[in-house]
Amino acid sequence: MRLKNFPFFVLFFFFCFNSNQSWGLMSSNQQPQFFKLMKNSLFGDALSTWNVYDVGTNYCNFTGVRCDGQGLVTDLDLSGLSLSGIFPDGVCSYFPNLRVLRLSHNHLNKSSSFLNTIPNCSLLRDLNMSSVYLKGTLPDFSQMKSLRVIDMSWNHFTGSFPLSIFNLTDLEYLNFNENPELDLWTLPDSVSKLTKLTHMLLMTCMLHGNIPRSIGNLTSLVDLELSGNFLSGEIPKEIGNLSNLRQLELYYNYHLTGSIPEEIGNLKNLTDIDISVSRLTGSIPDSICSLPNLRVLQLYNNSLTGEIPKSLGNSKTLKILSLYDNYLTGELPPNLGSSSPMIALDVSENRLSGPLPAHVCKSGKLLYFLVLQNRFTGSIPETYGSCKTLIRFRVASNRLVGTIPQGVMSLPHVSIIDLAYNSLSGPIPNAIGNAWNLSELFMQSNRISGVIPHELSHSTNLVKLDLSNNQLSGPIPSEVGRLRKLNLLVLQGNHLDSSIPDSLSNLKSLNVLDLSSNLLTGRIPENLSELLPTSINFSSNRLSGPIPVSLIRGGLVESFSDNPNLCIPPTAGSSDLKFPMCQEPHGKKKLSSIWAILVSVFILVLGVIMFYLRQRMSKNRAVIEQDETLASSFFSYDVKSFHRISFDQREILESLVDKNIVGHGGSGTVYRVELKSGEVVAVKKLWSQSNKDSASEDKMHLNKELKTEVETLGSIRHKNIVKLFSYFSSLDCSLLVYEYMPNGNLWDALHKGFVHLEWRTRHQIAVGVAQGLAYLHHDLSPPIIHRDIKSTNILLDVNYQPKVADFGIAKVLQARGKDSTTTVMAGTYGYLAPEYAYSSKATIKCDVYSFGVVLMELITGKKPVDSCFGENKNIVNWVSTKIDTKEGLIETLDKRLSESSKADMINALRVAIRCTSRTPTIRPTMNEVVQLLIDATPQGGPDMTSKPTTKIKDSIVSDHLTQTRL
């Protein structure tokens, strides 16, 4: 029987063999056609060696091509070849045996449709389309049962996330990072099917809702990244079942709440943990700090309490510890860093106390040491002098005592040393001359004594030097004039004596020079007038002799007050009641008398002529009388100038007429004034005291407070902060002279229809405003809080670059009782942070909230308070009701803007939502906002910065460490 059927088996085998050969032959014949299609539609040097028209060509030798034994293509890897153009459709119709398709890091046409045919590749195991920047919807992957690797990161996919992926049970690597244009979607319970998955990378891809408990079934996971999404609720304790996990990234999910699960401490292979910028509460589990392989622990910007577990000090692997902006108490582990290769430590803005850890840089690798704004006590350990790798050393605003170690001041790579606001004593170490890379040195408000060492001049990269409010004595070293990059020199509030060195005139980059409240004697060097721009304060010293004429004409006379032996030189052409005229030698007096007679005669003749003209021009008498009034009122003004600008103060006063009014605001009336030089300035006449019966003493107090604020504003130098030229003050009126902004303010541009701002311009405005506020918050000490961020206080120059205006003025005007558009506090309804409305206490996070409202204005085109939001609604509440669906998100966007901008606008909206969180600690800092907005730069826009890496590597640290503590 078997022999009888044998011929049929032979025939069947022969048929199948020939069929396979025929199929292979047919497929092999189709392959050249697809290579020709690729050659014709893709462009790049890498394909120049593809000779597709030669009949004898072996395609298997082409770049990126691999074949099996029958010559059938199995791998097509064109990654990183800088190709452009269109990838042809139907790749698997031509390559049916294809196992690997990698097209990552190319510049393919965004509208390419080839992706829709990919599910036909039933044998495909590895699909990589990362950083191709494709658009459109994603296909159904359910038929691709062989798929092991899928990487669709850094694209612009829209529509629904393909949940069918979670049925591909052989999947090992899943990456959809940075797809912010997808619809909001929730991680399904079916994720538990992916038991072979080692990498789940779903950062910034519109995930929302809770993290499912079933995620605990993915026991093969090595890397779990869900950062930058809208996840909410508590972190499930089942994550503690992921025994192979090495990296856990959940940061920037600001609706995550609850405590950190103790069970995470079960993950003995875990190396990196980042759950920053969320709403976590409770303490840091000891079990986490005891993990044997922990390298990175970042939990900053939460509401964590309690002490830092002592077990963290025993770690042998810890490199980066970032816990800033929490409510942590107690002491740092005393042995922190003694056994581990620490690179960065930032525990700033907590309530930590006790001594600083002595051996934190024992490994010799520490780059960043930041412990600002805590309650640390004791001295700075001598061992810190051996931290030769340090780049930033910031211990400001603590309770440190003792002397400054020589070694700390001679660190060869350090760029910032910040010791301000402590109780440090002793001299400035001479070793400061060895800090060749030092750019910023802050030592203000300590008890430092001795002299300023001349070795300081060796630190030629210094840009900022603040030694104010100490007990320094002796002369100002002439060698300071060698610090040619210096733009801030503050020595105020010491016991410095001798004369002001002429060499200071070499500091051509200087913006701020404050030598006030010392014991300086002698004359003021005439050549100091060469410093441009100038903000000078020499008040409260023992200076004598004439004030340089150029400084008088620059309106800087007030900067020399409380120097009773100073005088006004006759050549100044005017006198100031605060200073006497300088006495002239006898010979010059006689000559002066002759000149006085000649001038008197000239004035008499001129008076006769004027009288005649007035008789003939009686119709202009009212105007002339007004001029006389202005002229007389001029002498009642105090004038303070902050920049060199050529104008006669009388010009300003004469131009304050109705026809020059360009706007009214909560703080006053704004005039456009064209000077004789042709330059145009803006003059803001601040609202005067509303209570006319107020005591003169009260008025003087308020004016003094305003003057203090204005002098601070006048010292500011930043491209996104409006330049304040001058300030006029009297008991009844205050004038601010600003640079003129020809395109008005942002409110008018957005809401009055004067101009159409495309998204790219709006984004530019948002970044500029954020950079200006970041400067006020993070680059000044102490920080300046604006208190009244709103679109009317954002001015636009000729190129629509934004300039922040009116910062610091609001709180003084509130005391005057006249700011009609503000609430009881400084600030404007619709822009006020919720906690400010309750507590009346302004913080930098209040400014962040107000900026978030402005950003929403830019994105939606709507006003902060509008009837379209319904009863008791504002723009923040309205947006919060729309973000649960993709349709809702689209509905919030300004309909006047092009469809192509929607994705970029949604990216920016995510930033605005973070800024307007009701919990202040959840809001990012303005430095972080700048980075977030730069990351959201419209496609094709300027390359403002490189993309941040999504993981912490050995060679880098968090954005906060590298960018925000400046």
UniProtKB/Swiss-Prot annotation:
Traits of the deletion mutant: Defects in vascular organization and phloem differentiation in inflorescence stems, characterized by aberrant accumulation of highly lignified cells, typical of xylem or fiber cells, within the phloem, and phloem cells sometimes adjacent to xylem cells. Malformed vascular cells files, probably due to defects in oriented cell divisions or cell morphology, and leading to both phloem specification defects and disrupted xylem vessel formation. Short inflorescence stems and increased anthocyanin accumulation in leaves.
Tissue-specificity statement: Expressed in the vasculature, especially in phloem and procambium regions, of stems, leaves, cotyledons, sepals, pedals, pedicels, hypocotyls and roots (in primary and lateral roots, but not in root tips). Expressed in the root from the basal meristem onward. Present in the phloem pole pericycle and in the adjacent phloem.
EC numbers for this chain: 2.7.10.1
Compartment list: Cell membrane
Region described as Disordered: 937-966
TM region(s), chain numbering: 593-613
UniProt-annotated catalytic positions: 788
InterPro entries: Kinase-like_dom_sf, Leu-rich_rpt, Leu-rich_rpt_typical-subtyp, LRR_dom_sf, LRR_N_plant-typ, Prot_kinase_dom, Protein_kinase_ATP_BS, Ser/Thr_kinase_AS
LRR repeats: 70-94, 95-120, 122-144, 145-168, 170-194, 195-218, 219-242, 245-267, 268-291, 292-315, 317-339, 341-363, 365-386, 387-411, 412-435, 437-459, 460-483, 484-507, 508-531, 533-554
Residues exposed to the Extracellular side: 23-592
Enzyme class label: transferase
One Gene Ontology CC term in the entry: plasma membrane
Domain Protein kinase: 656-934
Key words of the record: ATP-binding, Cell membrane, Developmental protein, Glycoprotein, Kinase, Leucine-rich repeat, Membrane, Nucleotide-binding, Phosphoprotein, Receptor, Repeat, Serine/threonine-protein kinase, Signal, Transferase, Transmembrane, Transmembrane helix
SUPFAM superfamilies per record: L domain-like (SSF52058), Protein kinase-like (PK-like) (SSF56112), RNI-like (SSF52047)
A Pfam entry, by short name: LRR_1
Signal peptide per UniProt: 1-22
Modified residues (Phosphotyrosine): 738, 775, 831, 838
MF terms (GO), sorted A to Z: ATP binding; peptide binding; peptide hormone binding; peptide hormone receptor binding; peptide receptor activity; protein serine/threonine kinase activity; transmembrane receptor protein tyrosine kinase activity
Function: Receptor kinase involved in the perception of C-terminally encoded plant signaling peptide (CEP) and subsequent regulation of root and shoot development. Required for xylem and phloem cell files morphology and organization, probably by preventing ectopic lignification in phloem cells. Together with CEPR2, mediates systemic nitrogen (N)-demand signaling upon the perception of root-derived peptides (e.g. CEP1) via the up-regulation of genes involved in N uptake and assimilation pathways.
Assembly and interaction partners: Interacts with the root-derived peptides CEP1, CEP3 and CEP5.
Family that this chain belongs to: Belongs to the protein kinase superfamily. Ser/Thr protein kinase family.
Protein name as catalogued: Receptor protein-tyrosine kinase CEPR1
